[in-house]
């Protein structure tokens, strides 16, 4: 059943996903080869209607699922009971803080940080993402500020040696680009393919970002 669900997700077939989980809600508990539950697979898909229905059908949420689904009170309850969970990777390799960031759960991210979550902790899967990478991917400026205040390494790399600045430049988000540079992001770091944040902005024609980075590079 999990393989059928995965096929529907790959093909972005929301109606078939919803029909599948309505008929077989137990698939939400099943785990794929990467360690993701059916619920998490749907969450990662970005298919909002299917995700909303999955949350309605799910009866019990583990710690990481509670974060992804924005269940603040349940996350808090887990932390009060098991403090060490704040830095425990999910079965598919992501940190609690990175999951909170990726799903724009800023209040949950704040709760995790207040309870000892390490902002620099990377995923154990091939993505190697940390919370800042996820926050930049979602263009969540406030969370980026919060992570920086909590000492995150702005130059940490994920897969292909991508930094948060590379990601922000790719998105053309000048506000986050400035925030990162003002807090120590190195402009000339290269990805595996040789691109810098400046060259990315130039290629994608994000003129304001390019002009800002080019000026900073020449100082």
Annotate each predicted stretch with a short phrase.
Residues 27-28, 85-86, 119-121, 154, ...:
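Ankyrin-repeat inter-repeat connecting loop/turn
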Residues 1-33, 70-92:
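N-terminal segments that cap or nucleate solenoid repeat domains
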Residues 7-12, 41-47, 65-71, 99-105, ...:
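Ankyrin repeat A-helix N-terminal signature
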Residues 35, 59, 93, 127-128, ...:
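Start-of-repeat signature of ankyrin repeats
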Residues 1-7, 51-66, 150, 183, ...:
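Ankyrin-repeat-protein effector appendages
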Residues 14-21, 47-54, 71-79, 105-113, ...:
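Ankyrin repeat structural motif
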Residues 122-125, 129-149, 155:
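Alpha-helical adaptor scaffolds
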Residues 31-32, 89-90, 123-125, 158, ...:
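Ankyrin repeat boundary/linker residues
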């Amino acid at each position: 059943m999990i393989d059928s669900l995965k096929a529907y997700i790959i093909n972005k077939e929301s109606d078939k996903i919803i029909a599948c989980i309505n008929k077989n809600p137990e698939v939400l508990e099943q785990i794929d080869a990467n360690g993701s539950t059916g619920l998490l697979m749907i969450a990662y898909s970005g298919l909002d209607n299917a995700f909303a229905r999955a949350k309605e059908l799910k009866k019990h949420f583990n710690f990481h699922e509670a974060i992804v689904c924005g269940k603040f009170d349940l996350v808090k309850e887990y932390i009060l009971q098991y403090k060490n969970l704040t830095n425990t990777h999910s079965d598919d390799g992501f940190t609690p803080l990175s999951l909170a960031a990726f799903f724009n759960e800023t209040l949950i991210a704040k709760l995790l940080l207040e309870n000892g979550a390490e902002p620099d902790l990377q995923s154990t899967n091939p993505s190697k993402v940390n919370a800042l990478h996820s926050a930049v991917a979602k263009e969540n400026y406030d969370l980026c500020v919060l992570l920086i205040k909590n000492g995150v390494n702005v130059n940490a790399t994920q897969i292909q040696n991508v930094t948060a600045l590379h990601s922000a430049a790719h998105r053309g988000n000048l506000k986050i680009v400035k925030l990162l540079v003002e807090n120590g992001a190195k402009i000339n770091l290269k990805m595996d393919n040789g691109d810098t944040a400046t060259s990315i902005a130039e290629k994608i024609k994000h003129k304001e970002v390019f002009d800002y980075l080019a000026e900073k590079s020449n100082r």
